[in-house]
Amino acid sequence: MEFEFIRNTLMGEYYVKCSMGHEIVGRWLQEEIGKDPAKIAQVEALIDQAFSSPSQEHRLTGAEISLMIHGDEVLVQENALGHEYEVEMESEFDFYDAESTASCGIEDFCTLIEQWKDFLNI
């Protein structure tokens, strides 16, 4: 997973761009976590729990996007896709679904979080 951090110094805003197929990870980091040190600490605690209990699923539910860690796999998914019932969707929505969920290895995810902290000087 490739990513880039962008700082708008005039507006004091921070942006995350992730490689194709991982856009939702950037949206999650930017919208759900942002610059909040408490939320970043919460993500780090979840990662620690995942390393301590890799056979369990660890979840951080956000307002629109959630994070799940199971073993060495990280899944970031829009909450709208987490419904327990299946809805028949037309094929033109498949591309949208692909942008609404992404997975990566836990090591890549840890690198993303550490570099985000460094970028924000937290």
UniProtKB/Swiss-Prot annotation:
UniProt cross-references to InterPro entries, sorted A to Z: UPF0231
Positions in coiled-coil regions: none
Signal peptide: none
Domain of life according to the entry: Bacteria
Alphabetized NCBIfam families for the sequence: PRK05248.2-4
Family that this chain belongs to: Belongs to the UPF0231 family.
Protein name stated in the entry: UPF0231 protein VIBHAR_03438
Organism of this sequence: Vibrio campbellii (strain ATCC BAA-1116)
